[in-house]
């Protein structure tokens, strides 16, 4: 039985978001072909003093790739920093060459460009706005705003350059020119270290550079974001941005997928700018720097993200991270009292829980997606921006083929070594498809969802206005209070099936004593907690990690598991079993009360199912 690949089946009629290569932008393809895996750069040659990191390529390789591109526009008499320059526009780069002998050349890669404008018509001045790297260390990406001011000889040249620049770098973006877009920013002022408002002030300067329309909403308490997700006017915004931890995003998704028009609503691009304690989604997509996230919002490229349906009886929740039971949820929920300590609260909570360890009995039912042991699971390529597995029509077959290919190549390599025919290592190193396949969502629909707005506008909002409502509300005492109905996502009713029916459909069961479990659909639950290194954003699979109370158990070993989770190495422990599954059922024993959490939020303690819905929502991602 398979419930993973699509949702056009009788019981699952939700269709995954389109990830077809036909929807890739030509600009993105060119950038991948010319500078694969590059961080967006401003590079000065020949000295190669770069403002940004140059990633995994040398300046010579970069220049060679760019030299192969066609020149779209050229002007040899432009003033930059009071010096005469030649300006070239190519498909992926703006080039500024100083004309004097020995002058250097600047390359502004298109992925850093956020906007431009004619700043002074009387002096023919033009300003380009960008967001470039602060550091050469690509593992610690931080970005800053940077402006490039040019002066042209006359109005004709000024307008000609403006037309070519906008056409090449801004109009080609998936959601069109940023100045014609409308985004809504929702922030939680109490999230994490309470820095969300400060973060907004910083990134809003970049939004101003792009001339994007911004509406700011500050949440006023629990479930406010859920209510916004349920009733906001879908036609007013093309992107929803969150400044918070994962909790606010979780709330909004549960409102969004409760709408009667959820099939249309789920296509709207969503962006998460980390401002909380966990920030699992941001870490899973490699966007932990707020300014880098804002750049990604402006650029507007998206990838689909899996969502899981969690069910207990008639109650349902949507999950974007995980279902946890045992020590992980114990630490997460019980350490809330130490939230003022920031990330330290989890370390303190873990230490206290290990000293007073709880052992839980129960059953863990799961429907295998792949019959792989954890050594084989470790060989699955990690998710990337152009991910072969996430883009596949059948991720399970793709994973099986990758593992099989690795085994064949390893066998061949071993044979070559034994026969001494080749002393070098020719083992298979999995290379993901880098042709560029970031899904742009439904571009035509997105472009028609909003009208042109000339100037940026910031509106502080406590409650939506009456004309923002698009759905009938179940009112209580006032217009500000209403009940959001359960999620409309269709799921299979596994909790109603007997064990005989489950076994007949290929389910398996683990029974005994457990320290805890983590069932996740993304790699990270926090910056220092990589739950499953081989989890993918859109493969339709749940990574089930089980911490066993077996003969090899010790508190020292458990402490090692928790500390090594910061790198993902904990899955190698003898205490850990790992499975790639399509669905699972947790049956905790009633001999002691425990904690079950969905995305870090406490739910009732009892029999619980989890089912993954592939490519359910649209997430803003980077393109490099």
UniProtKB/Swiss-Prot annotation:
Asked whether the keyword Nucleus is assigned, the reply is: yes
Which residues does the annotation say bind ATP? 188-190, 219, 251, 276-278, 339, 345, 599-601
Q: What are the subcellular locations of this protein?
A: Cytoplasm; Nucleus
Binding of substrate occurs at: 244-247, 332
Gene Ontology BP terms: dihydrosphingosine-1-P pathway; positive regulation of asexual reproduction; response to curcumin; sphingosine biosynthetic process
The active-site annotation reads: 246 (proton donor/acceptor)
Superkingdom of source = Eukaryota
Protein name as it appears in the record: Sphingosine kinase A
Organism of derivation: Dictyostelium discoideum
This protein's gene is called: sgkA
């Amino acid at each position: 039985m398979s419930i993973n690949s699509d949702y056009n089946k009788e019981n699952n009629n939700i269709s995954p978001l389109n990830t077809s290569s036909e929807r890739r932008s030509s600009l993105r393809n060119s950038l991948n072909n010319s500078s694969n895996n590059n961080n967006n750069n401003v590079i000065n040659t020949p000295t190669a003093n770069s403002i940004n990191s140059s990633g995994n390529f040398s300046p010579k390789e970069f220049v060679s790739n760019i030299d192969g591109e066609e020149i779209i526009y050229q002007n040899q008499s432009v003033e930059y920093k009071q010096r005469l320059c030649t300006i070239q526009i190519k498909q992926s780069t703006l080039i500024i060459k100083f004309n004097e002998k020995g002058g250097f050349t600047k390359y502004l890669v298109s992925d850093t460009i956020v906007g431009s404008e004619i700043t002074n018509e009387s002096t023919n001045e033009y300003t380009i706005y960008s967001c470039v790297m602060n550091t050469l260390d690509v593992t610690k990406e931080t970005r800053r705003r940077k402006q490039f001011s040019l002066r042209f000889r006359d109005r004709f040249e000024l307008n000609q350059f403006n037309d070519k620049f906008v056409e090449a770098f801004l109009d080609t973006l998936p959601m069109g020119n940023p100045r014609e877009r409308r985004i809504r920013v929702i922030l939680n002022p109490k999230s994490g270290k309470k820095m969300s408002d400060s973060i907004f002030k910083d990134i809003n300067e970049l939004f101003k550079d792009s001339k994007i329309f911004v509406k700011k909403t500050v949440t006023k308490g629990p479930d406010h974001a859920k209510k916004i997700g349920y009733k906001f006017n879908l036609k007013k915004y093309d992107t929803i941005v969150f400044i918070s931890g994962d909790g606010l995003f979780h709330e909004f998704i549960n409102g969004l997928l409760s709408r009667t028009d959820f099939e249309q609503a789920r296509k709207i691009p969503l962006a998460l700018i980390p401002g909380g304690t966990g920030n699992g989604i941001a870490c899973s997509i490699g966007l932990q720097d707020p300014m880098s996230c804002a750049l990604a919002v402006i650029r507007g490229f998206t990838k689909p993200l899996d969502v899981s349906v969690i069910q207990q009886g008639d109650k349902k929740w949507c999950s974007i991270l995980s279902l946890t039971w045992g020590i992980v949820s114990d630490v997460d929920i019980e350490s809330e009292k130490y939230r003022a300590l920031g990330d330290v609260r989890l370390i303190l909570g873990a230490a206290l829980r290990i000293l007073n360890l709880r052992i839980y009995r129960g059953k863990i039912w799961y429907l295998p997606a792949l019959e792989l042991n954890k050594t084989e699971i470790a060989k699955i390529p990690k998710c990337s921006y152009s991910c072969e597995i996430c883009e596949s029509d059948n991720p399970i077959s793709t994973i099986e083929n990758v593992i099989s290919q690795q085994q064949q190549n390893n066998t061949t390599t071993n044979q070559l070594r034994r026969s001494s025919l080749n002393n070098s290592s020719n083992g298979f190193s999995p290379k993901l498809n880098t042709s560029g396949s970031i899904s742009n969502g439904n571009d035509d629909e997105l472009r028609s969802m909003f009208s042109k707005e000339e100037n940026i506008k910031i509106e502080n909002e406590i409650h939506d206005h009456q004309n923002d409502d698009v759905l009938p509300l179940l009112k209580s005492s006032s217009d500000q209070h209403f009940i959001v109905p359960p999620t409309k996502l269709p799921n299979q009713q596994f909790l109603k099936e007997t064990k005989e029916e489950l076994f007949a459909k290929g389910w398996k069961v683990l029974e005994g004593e457990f320290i805890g479990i983590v069932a996740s659909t993304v790699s990270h639950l926090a910056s220092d907690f990589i739950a499953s290194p081989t989890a993918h954003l859109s493969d339709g699979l749940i990574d089930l990690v089980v911490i066993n109370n077996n003969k090899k158990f010790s508190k020292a070993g458990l402490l090692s598991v928790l500390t090594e989770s910061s790198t993902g190495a904990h899955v190698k422990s003898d205490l850990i079993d790992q499975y790639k599954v399509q669905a699972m059922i947790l049956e905790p024993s009633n001999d002691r009360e425990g904690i079950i959490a969905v995305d870090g939020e406490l739910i009732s303690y009892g029999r619980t199912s989890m089912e993954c819905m592939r490519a359910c929502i649209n997430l803003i991602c980077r393109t490099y």
